[in-house]
């Protein structure tokens, strides 16, 4: 069916080093960036039933001295028979000290409503965790707090010399 989308990406980027990788420069979008999408499904357009699919994302970041502060939010789902189905919404807030050593902190929370049977919010590698027993959660929501101290132990020059 018909699709209506809007996306805004602010032309505000900074170049940082020591955020996700030690020795490379990265472009970080400061935003605010967001996108919204709605798709209408209807038998008139070849769909099997009437429903409205929706999705949206938002992102903002800022730099305060050596700290990079990040925020993200998102939602997706569908409206069908007057109710929300397969609805997932979440928020993530993070902070990282830039440079060769520093703290990285992340708080993520995600919830759902009437998930389809083939969808689950897992505590797996997609959000940085491994080895969690599935008996500890029902797959309808998740929350995660990461706090880590990072320090570069040795630095390489041209992949030949380490110091």
Residue ranges and their predicted role:
Residues 1-162:
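C-terminal outer-membrane beta-barrel translocator/porin domains of Gram-negative envelope proteins
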């Amino acid at each position: 069916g018909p699709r209506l989308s809007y996306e805004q990406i602010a032309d505000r980027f900074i170049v940082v080093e020591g955020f996700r990788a030690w020795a490379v420069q990265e472009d970080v979008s400061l935003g605010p960036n967001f996108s919204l999408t709605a798709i209408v499904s209807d038998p008139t357009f070849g769909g099997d039933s009437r429903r409205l699919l929706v999705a949206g994302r938002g992102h903002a970041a800022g730099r305060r001295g050596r700290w990079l502060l990040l925020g993200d939010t998102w939602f997706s789902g569908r409206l069908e028979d007057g109710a929300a189905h397969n609805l997932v919404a979440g928020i993530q807030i993070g902070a990282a000290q830039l440079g060769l050593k520093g703290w990285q902190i992340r708080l993520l929370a995600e919830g759902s409503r009437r998930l389809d049977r083939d969808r689950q919010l897992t505590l797996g590698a997609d959000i940085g965790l491994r080895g969690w027993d599935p008996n500890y959660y029902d797959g309808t929501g998740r929350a995660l707090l990461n706090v880590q101290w990072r320090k570069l132990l040795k630095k390489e020059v041209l992949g030949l010399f380490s110091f």
